[in-house]
Amino acid sequence: MEEALVKRIMPNSLEAEQSVIGSMIMDKDAIVTAMEMLISEDFYHTQYGILFDTMIELYNKGLPVDLVTLQNKLKEKDVPPEIASLEFVRDLVTAVPTSANVKYYAQIVKDNSMRRKLIKLNEEIENECYVGKESVETVMDITEKKVFDLLSTRGGGGDYVPVSYTHLRAHET
């Protein structure tokens, strides 16, 4: 019986990644929502991870996050010109009809990131089993630890939340 060859592409959604970034440019509240859920490594397409980190950096410094400041900061960071171009950044804003759905877009990005991490973890476990140097018990222990570590990252990008924002949240409750 022949197995069908399946072209495997790592899980990702270009549209969701673009929508998260576009929403963050459009709305300061979307920045907070996105940074609570994501880290730059969650983006499959590197350019959006770079934009994400740059916007978080601007936001954490209390600077406006708009087309001009973002483009200027990207140029300072010496990123590739295609990422720092005004057209590239502006196209992200025009691609998003509303920032109201940023949480949904961010969840898609996060889910795909977790899928990629699970695939990588599965490959590591598979390789351990094929190599056969460790006992089954040791491989099981390593697997359990790695799965637990992965589960602990589900919460998102809490590392980016500024102290002032945390302080405000504490007073709201």
Model-derived features with residue positions:
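Extended, charged alpha-helical coiled-coil/arm scaffolds that mediate oligomerization and mechanical coupling
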Residues: 86-142, 152
